């Protein structure tokens, strides 16, 4: 954490964004790069980080560029049959969209920092457990500060002009139209 903060020594946070970090080599054998990615978002150094099913941090542009993107947001504590069913049915519908190339879809399981906090600060082991479960079922994970869905879609729009979809439950859909968010 201190190393990450030191990267901003004498630099305004809004003048520099660090959107990925990867530590390799013998001196960093005990470092889980997913924790470093989480810290980037938690400390406000970037708004989103991505890691692939093999647990490797990746640049968002490398994962999302020119892709059709389908995301599901949740706490995934744990991943439930309902989550899996929602993504399966959503993906089936998304593939049927006329402008979607079914061979060019990137599915993301998004967890917001607020979903990680629960009732206090983020429990890093809990985060790793959730990430491990998602990765073990072959999913790409997005950790973000995007509380509002339109901000998430804006983030996707920086990387693709293709189709985008966000899967949500009925309660969330109703909540989106609540005036307090606008």
Where are the predicted features?
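Nucleotidyltransferase catalytic core that binds NTPs
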Residues: 1-182
């Amino acid at each position: 954490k201190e190393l990450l903060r030191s990267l901003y020594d004498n630099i305004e946070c809004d003048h520099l964004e660090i959107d990925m970090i990867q530590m390799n080599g013998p001196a960093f054998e005990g470092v889980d790069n997913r924790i470093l990615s989480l810290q980037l978002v938690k400390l406000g150094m970037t708004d989103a980080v991505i890691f692939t099913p093999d647990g490797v941090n990746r640049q968002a542009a490398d994962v999302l560029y020119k892709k059709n993107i389908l995301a599901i947001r949740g706490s995934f504590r744990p991943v439930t049959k309902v989550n899996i069913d929602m993504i399966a049915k959503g993906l089936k519908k998304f593939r049927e969209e006329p402008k979607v190339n079914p061979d060019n879809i990137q599915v993301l399981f998004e967890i917001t920092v607020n979903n990680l906090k629960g009732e206090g600060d983020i429990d890093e082991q809990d985060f790793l457990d959730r990430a491990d479960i998602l990765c073990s079922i072959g999913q790409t994970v997005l950790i973000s500060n995007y509380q509002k869905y339109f901000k998430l879609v804006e983030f996707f729009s920086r990387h693709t002009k293709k189709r985008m979809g966000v899967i949500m439950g009925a309660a969330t859909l109703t909540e989106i139209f609540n005036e307090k968010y606008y």
